[in-house]
Amino acid sequence: MAVPKRRHSKSRTRKRRSTYYNELEPPQLMECNNCGNPKVMHRACKHCGHYRGRQVIEPSDELIA
């Protein structure tokens, strides 16, 4: 089984990891057709519970807070 010959330094490890987080994109937001609040694409709205014009979940105060 292959084993690393030398230990990677903290700075080298952190440099490698930092590039991954810089490449991440924020989630795509769009306006809900029912209530107008911002929501994540292809997901039900947290505020009103609608998705593609249908009520799919009951909105609760816990989701909004």
UniProtKB/Swiss-Prot annotation:
Which spans are transmembrane here?
none
Q: Which keywords has UniProt assigned to this entry?
A: Ribonucleoprotein, Ribosomal protein
- Where on the tree of life does the source sit, at the highest rank? Bacteria
Q: A GO molecular function for this record?
A: structural constituent of ribosome
Q: Where is the composition biased (Basic residues)?
A: 1-18
Mention any one GO cellular component term assigned to this protein in its UniProt record.
large ribosomal subunit
GO annotation terms (biological process): translation
- Region (Disordered) residue ranges read 1-20
Which InterPro entries did the record assign?
Ribosomal_bL32, Ribosomal_bL32_bact, Ribosomal_zn-bd
Q: Name one Pfam family in it.
A: Ribosomal_L32p
> Which family does the similarity line name?
Belongs to the bacterial ribosomal protein bL32 family.
Instruction: Fetch the PANTHER family from UniProt.
Output: 50S RIBOSOMAL PROTEIN L32, LARGE RIBOSOMAL SUBUNIT PROTEIN BL32
* Name the UniProt record assigns to this protein: Large ribosomal subunit protein bL32
Organism in which the protein naturally occurs: Salinibacter ruber (strain DSM 13855 / M31)
